[in-house]
Curated annotation (Swiss-Prot):
Keyword Hydrolase: no
Organism: Aggregatibacter actinomycetemcomitans
Subcellular location: Cell inner membrane
InterPro entries reported in the protein's UniProt record: AAA+_ATPase, ABC_SmlMolc_Importer, ABC_transporter-like_ATP-bd, ABC_transporter-like_CS, Mo/tungstate-bd_C_term_dom, P-loop_NTPase, PotA-like, PotA_ATP-bd
Catalytic activity from the UniProt record: ATP + H2O + polyamine-[polyamine-binding protein]Side 1 = ADP + phosphate + polyamineSide 2 + [polyamine-binding protein]Side 1
Record protein name field: Spermidine/putrescine import ATP-binding protein PotA
SUPFAM superfamilies named among the record's database cross-references: MOP-like, P-loop containing nucleoside triphosphate hydrolases
Lineage: Bacteria, Pseudomonadati, Pseudomonadota, Gammaproteobacteria, Pasteurellales
Family as reported in the entry's similarity comment: Belongs to the ABC transporter superfamily. Spermidine/putrescine importer (TC 3.A.1.11.1) family.
Oligomeric form and interacting partners: The complex is composed of two ATP-binding proteins (PotA), two transmembrane proteins (PotB and PotC) and a solute-binding protein (PotD).
One Pfam family matching this protein: TOBE_2
Length: 372
């Protein structure tokens, strides 16, 4: 069954607070998660993302607040009685049991009739394409196969929500990319809510319907992967999600409701923003490396671009990255271009004088956080 994200809430976290001793991890935290959603809780170490997951699973007790699952208050419901299952980073498979017995374990703990266990286990193994591995032991499987068994063991219980705690971090790069795709497909097939916890922004952007980015126990931004990447709400979000250039800008004048004339690192140009501004106000102009264009200049040419010299070039297969040091102040900008060996305009050299520009309207403009 193809999954379509519904707007009906499946989980509501209402003003939850959790402390360890005198250290408050999250305080008055609110979050609504919709039915059938693939939601990723993303953030650096210590931001509170794993604490939120453990509270959802019932592995930690709240100090205050409420957790609502499908309309029912489960704040005081023990972990084993919640319709929630967790796939841990370690997978936590029993090495002495066969794959079949590992997947069947939860059903036996719930005293499900034996006649019902076999078809449900085989169906779960079929979903993760490991039905033929039923009689093997976990040590006979690869890391990716163990990951899928851990997921099968969780979904066989027919949970309303599946929690995944950094469960791809132990895999190598190629297998991790494969499992990202497989998890997304499986979630759509099952039609249940996945809540994935990670510090890896690429995983979050690749897999999620929605990302909640945490910082010090608070939500820094909540939105779709595209919104988070292209429209960061603040400098922390912009820097956490991929590479970003942060240029200093000084307001010259407002030209219209959405256009401001500004001096950006020596380049006088239009920037697009509806932020209230006044003359000489400091702003920050954010641009992804792939949104910047290099223009070749001779040593005496003046341009409406930011002028600088190329100080480093890095070939990355599909792209070519150039670091440009600005003549005006010695700051540096990063430019990423799709590599085309037949394009003479890409043949820049170390030390070459260049100008950098961008497509007007592609920039993100924020108030200068250093001067607030």
């Amino acid at each position: 069954m193809e999954n379509t994200v519904q707007n009906k809430p499946i989980i509501e976290l209402r003003s939850i607070t959790k402390s360890y001793g005198s250290n408050t991890i999250i305080k008055d935290f609110n979050l609504t998660i919709n039915n059938g959603e693939f939601l990723t809780i993303l953030g650096p170490s210590g931001c509170g993302k794993t604490t939120v997951l453990r509270l959802l699973a019932g592995l930690e007790e709240l100090d205050s607040g409420n957790i609502i699952l499908d309309g029912e208050d489960i704040t005081n419901v023990p972990a084993e009685k919640r319709h929630v299952n967790t796939v841990f980073q370690s997978y936590a498979l029993f090495p002495h049991m066969t794959i079949f017995e590992n997947v069947a374990f939860g059903l036996r703990m719930q005293k499900v009739p034996e006649a019902e266990i076999k078809p449900r286990v085989l169906e779960a193994l079929r979903m993760v394409q490991l039905e033929e591995m039923a009689d093997r032991k976990p040590t006979q499987l690869s890391g990716g196969q163990q990951q899928r068994i851990a997921i099968a063991r969780a979904v066989v219980n027919k949970p309303k929500v599946l929690l995944l705690d950094e469960s791809l971090s132990a895999l190598d790069y190629k297998l991790r990319k494969q499992m990202q795709y497989e998890l997304k497909v499986l979630q759509r097939q099952l039609g249940i809510t996945f809540i994935f916890v990670t510090h890896d922004q690429e995983e979050a952007i690749t897999m999620s319907d929605r990302i909640v980015l945490l910082r010090k126990g608070k939500i820094a931004q909540d939105g779709s992967p595209r919104e988070i990447y292209e429209e960061p709400a603040n400098l922390f979000v912009a820097r956490f999600i991929g590479e970003i250039n942060v240029f200093d800008a000084t307001v010259i004048e407002r030209k219209s409701e959405n256009v401001v004339l500004a001096n950006v690192e020596g380049r006088v140009c239009d920037i697009y923003t509806d932020i209230p501004v006044k003359k000489d106000q400091q702003l920050q102009v954010l641009l992804r490396p792939e949104d910047i264009v290099i223009k070749e200049l001779d040593e005496h040419e003046h341009s409406k671009a930011i002028i600088g010299h190329i100080i480093d070039r890095t070939y990355k297969g599909m792209t070519l990255e150039s670091t440009v040091e600005f003549e005006q102040n010695g700051k540096r900008g990063l430019v990423s271009e799709f590599f085309n060996e037949d394009d003479p305009h890409m043949d820049h050299s170390i030390g070459q004088r260049v100008g950098i520009t961008w497509h007007e309207g592609w920039e993100v403009v924020l108030n200068d956080e250093d001067n607030q």
